[in-house]
Regions:
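Residue-level "contact hotspot" at macromolecular interaction interfaces
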Residues: 13, 34-36, 69, 113, ...
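Short, structured interface segments
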Residues: 62-83, 169-175
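Local cysteine-cluster metal-coordination motifs and their immediate loop/turn environment
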Residues: 29-51, 59-72, 285
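FNR/FR-type flavoprotein reductase catalytic core
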Residues: 144, 152-367, 373-374
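Short, surface-exposed secondary-structure boundary micro-motifs
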Residues: 48, 79-81, 125, 178
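Ferredoxin-reductase
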Residues: 86-172, 225-227, 252-254
């Protein structure tokens, strides 16, 4: 049994029980997607009319297209996003932000267009690809073609343990993307931004862009860490305060002392309402808790859960890493306050967008894989 599925104005034939992503691909319309497991939120679409089986992913009038299935005629729409592209570059900077958090700067041969809050699949030569969220420097800037990443060093991590050793300045890097639906959108209501751990990276990108492009919107910013010394983002919070943001909260589960508040970011969420837009990134428990509170208040919520890779560094991997390691690796130096190079990330509106309903040839097939951050 087939039905008419209208996607951004284009009608395609869809089979009963197909996911919306597969139905779109069958009609040469690529709904933006990434993990295909309901985690990344890249494929969230708006149901304009008709009926779909939301498979438990409904939020307001939206569903996840990789999970929701065709059961009747329906019309859906999704936000236009930059087309998926590939770029190559090299590591041009490594700095320590906290005992277990490193800033890695990658400069691309040519810039990649993306929206603040989206993420990329990043492959350091010789290592598995990882999903990383580009951000801006702590003074709100980023140079042309420059990607700034905040990476947590996990014990036994295949990639993160090699930063500063095998992965040094000059190391080759390939990126693919962008992905993710938790990007800054135009609007008028208050913004509530919540970041836990290195989830601060995309939240900081969104915050800096909002201060550049949407200064009319009130901002509430909450940054959290397990331990107070993990609040590596304080310089960016100072930047926001100097720029006029007054509602800034930092939390820590241990070691908190004034002005850091004890507990978790969810303990200090403001009273939410339908006029609020919430962005949250970080550990899945934090993301889930914020989504539940947002849903209960009918606030819009865009989420980016950070999922650690469960695969440890094997003995063979350790031996191979030692063989690849140069004889003398330079030390990782503490981050210094950077000199402004260019005003922030490339503006999201400076991009070529396909017309509604036009297929995105950059996504010819489902990209199905577990997302990993280490």
């Amino acid at each position: 049994m087939s039905f008419d599925l209208v996607i951004n104005g284009k009608t395609v034939k869809a089979n009963y029980g197909e996911t919306l992503v597969d139905a779109g691909l069958g009609g040469w319309v690529a709904i933006p997607h990434d993990c295909c497991s309901g985690q990344c939120e890249t494929c969230r679409v708006t149901v304009l009319s008709g009926r779909v089986d939301d498979r438990g992913t409904a939020e307001r009038n939206t569903v996840l297209a990789c999970q929701a299935k065709v059961v009747a005629n329906a019309e859906i729409a999704f936000d236009h996003v930059p087309e998926i592209a590939k770029r190559s570059g090299a590591v041009t900077g490594i700095a320590t932000l906290a005992p277990d958090i490193i800033e890695v700067t990658v400069t691309l041969a040519s810039p990649i267009t993306m929206r603040p809050g989206q993420y990329l699949s990043v492959k350091f030569a010789g290592f598995p690809a990882r999903d990383l969220s580009p951000t801006v420097r702590f003074d709100g800037t980023a140079g042309p073609g420059e990607l700034v990443f905040h990476i947590r060093r996990y014990p036994g991590g295949l990639m993160s343990t090699q930063i500063g050793a095998t992965i040094r300045e000059g190391h080759r890097v390939q990126v693919r993307g962008p992905f993710g639906g938790a990007f800054l959108r135009e609007g008028y209501g208050p913004l509530v931004l919540v970041g836990g751990g290195t989830g601060w990276a995309p939240i900081w990108a969104v915050a800096a862009a909002a201060r550049r492009e949407q200064r009319h919107r009130d901002l509430v910013v909450i940054a959290g860490a397990r331990e107070a010394e993990g609040l590596y983002m304080r310089r960016s919070l100072d930047w926001l305060m100097d720029d006029g943001v007054r509602e800034i909260i930092t939390t820590a589960e241990t070691g908190a002392h004034n002005p850091v508040l004890p507990g978790r970011p969810t303990h200090y969420l403001p009273s939410l309402g339908p006029e609020d837009t919430v962005y949250v990134a970080g550990p899945p428990p934090l993301v889930d808790a914020v989504k539940i509170k947002s849903r209960a208040a009918w606030a819009r919520c865009y989420a980016d859960p950070f999922l650690p890779n469960a695969q440890p560094l094997s003995l063979i991997d350790r031996v191979m890493a030692m063989l690849r390691r140069p004889a003398a690796a330079p030390a990782v130096t503490p981050a210094s306050r950077p000199v402004p190079v260019a005003a922030g990330l490339p503006a999201a509106r400076k991009r070529s967008e396909p017309a509604p309903g036009v297929a995105r040839t950059a996504t010819p097939a489902r990209r199905s894989q577990a997302r990993s951050r280490v």
